């Protein structure tokens, strides 16, 4: 019945840790190697030593490589078109966050709080791309979570701690690395409280999720199953401290501009009709820049959650000119990506100016922003990309407005031959 008696080796001798000298019944576990043993306490001590050395090495190595806000913004400019105000806000917030990690342990007098970020902007305005680019620039683990799939613990759906598990997966379960990562929570506006009044029924995907997320964002020790998860339930859970993980939450917040306008109208004293007319002339981007915490609370975010998102950056709706620039200018612009694909077939592709304008117009009509540009171009080039590998001597493909509108086929230019239409 009682299993507390010390186990013995094959020769009936007690086994001892080769490092600290404790016997096997003085420790929880004794791990055997070729003619040596190590106990769980010594393993933990070794882990602590390695962890401290890694932190010192990371802090000393990164301090000289942390880009300044100007440098961060310059790199964002290479990948994201427009959104200058949001880039400036993000550059400062991210710089301060990682500077805080480097200097946090060196200053005992002042404790620097974490500044999580809330991005507000329409679909396809670049919220996710900004967060992805920041993580790539800083070389830190990055994961995206969809707030609409999250529920409170115990209900059908994803538990909020699954977010940390995804972050761990991105860095091969390196806990130290994960604890300095970036988490982007998309569609955060979809978990707003359903009404201003507290509900009698359980709101498992709204306020409840906000409360659960709040714990992660504030900083908690999250228990995450190791690799293998449920397949190996006997494994001990990994403990991840979320205090230094940067959370960036993004959402379209449809209807928020109306709340802001209503608040602004109430603020006017007299001449209300004149104030109203001035308010109505502002663009959605200008209105959103005037957002206050009370507007977000009225929208449905709980006050505690809003309080943990001190940095708010608003993104403008992209106009046709911005979409054309997105197609052509960024480092990984779509036209450059398709040009590379065609190069692999020893062929060039030319997008004429009117074609880019037609693609941008179509994206504006679909209200998909920059997100819809790729699918439009994929549809336009589908037949050409299907036929091209089977065709010989095609040196160039020309796309113009009529091709985008579906009124004509792309123009194919052959080597040492007369130009032909794709329909020939």
Curated annotation (Swiss-Prot):
Keywords: ATP-binding, Chaperone, Metal-binding, Nucleotide-binding, Zinc
Residues noted as binding ATP in the record, renumbered to the chain: 122-129
SUPFAM superfamilies to which the protein is assigned, alphabetical: Glucocorticoid receptor-like (DNA-binding domain), P-loop containing nucleoside triphosphate hydrolases
Any one GO molecular-function label of the UniProt entry: unfolded protein binding
Entry-linked InterPro entries: AAA+_ATPase, ATP-dep_Clp_protease_ClpX, ATPase_AAA_core, Clp_ATPase_C, Clp_protease_ATP-bd_su_ClpX, ClpX_bact, P-loop_NTPase, Znf_CppX_C4
Biological-process GO terms, alphabetical: cell division; proteolysis involved in protein catabolic process
Subunit structure comment from the entry: Component of the ClpX-ClpP complex. Forms a hexameric ring that, in the presence of ATP, binds to fourteen ClpP subunits assembled into a disk-like structure with a central cavity, resembling the structure of eukaryotic proteasomes.
Function: ATP-dependent specificity component of the Clp protease. It directs the protease to specific substrates. Can perform chaperone functions in the absence of ClpP.
UniProt name for this protein: ATP-dependent Clp protease ATP-binding subunit ClpX
Gene: clpX
């Amino acid at each position: 019945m009682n299993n507390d008696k010390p186990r013995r080796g094959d020769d009936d001798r007690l086994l001892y840790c080769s490092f600290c000298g404790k016997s096997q019944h003085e420790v929880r576990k004794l791990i055997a190697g070729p003619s040596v043993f190590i106990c769980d306490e010594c393993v933990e001590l070794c882990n602590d030593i390695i962890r401290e050395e890694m932190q010192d090495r990371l802090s000393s190595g990164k301090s000289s490589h942390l880009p300044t806000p100007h440098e961060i913004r310059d790199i964002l400019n290479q990948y994201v078109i427009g959104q200058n105000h949001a880039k400036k806000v993000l550059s400062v917030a991210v710089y301060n966050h990682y500077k805080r990690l480097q200097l946090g342990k060196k200053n005992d007098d002042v404790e620097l709080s974490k500044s999580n970020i809330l991005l507000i902007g329409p679909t396809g305005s670049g919220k996710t791309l900004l967060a992805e680019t920041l993580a790539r620039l800083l070389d830190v683990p990055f994961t995206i979570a969809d707030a609409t799939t999250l529920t409170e613990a115990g209900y059908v759906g994803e538990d909020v701690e699954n977010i940390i598990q995804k972050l761990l997966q991105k860095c091969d379960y390196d806990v130290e690395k994960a604890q300095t990562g970036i988490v982007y929570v998309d569609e955060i506006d979809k978990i707003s409280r359903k009404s201003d009044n507290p509900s009698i029924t359980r709101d498992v995907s709204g306020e409840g999720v906000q409360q659960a997320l709040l714990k992660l964002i504030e900083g908690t020790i999250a228990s995450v199953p190791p690799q293998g998860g449920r397949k190996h339930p006997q494994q001990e859970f990994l403990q991840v401290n979320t205090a230094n993980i940067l959370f960036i939450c993004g959402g379209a917040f449809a209807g928020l501009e109306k709340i802001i306008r209503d608040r602004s109208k109430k603020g006017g004293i007299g001449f209300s009709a004149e104030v109203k007319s001035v308010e109505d002339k502002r663009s959605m981007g200008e209105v959103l820049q005037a957002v206050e915490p009370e507007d977000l609370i009225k929208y449905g975010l709980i006050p505690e959650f809003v309080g943990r998102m001190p940095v708010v950056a608003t993104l403008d709706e992209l106009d046709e000119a911005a979409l054309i620039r997105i197609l052509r200018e960024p480092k990984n612009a779509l036209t450059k990506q398709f040009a590379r694909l065609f190069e692999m077939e020893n062929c060039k592709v030319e997008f004429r100016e009117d074609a880019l304008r037609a693609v941008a117009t179509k994206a504006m009509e679909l209200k998909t922003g920059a997100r819809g540009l790729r699918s439009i171009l994929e549809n336009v080039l589908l037949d050409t990309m299907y036929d091209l590998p089977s065709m010989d001597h095609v040196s160039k493909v020309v796309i113009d407005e009529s091709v985008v509108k579906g009124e004509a086929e792309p123009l194919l230019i052959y080597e040492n031959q007369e130009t032909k239409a794709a329909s020939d």
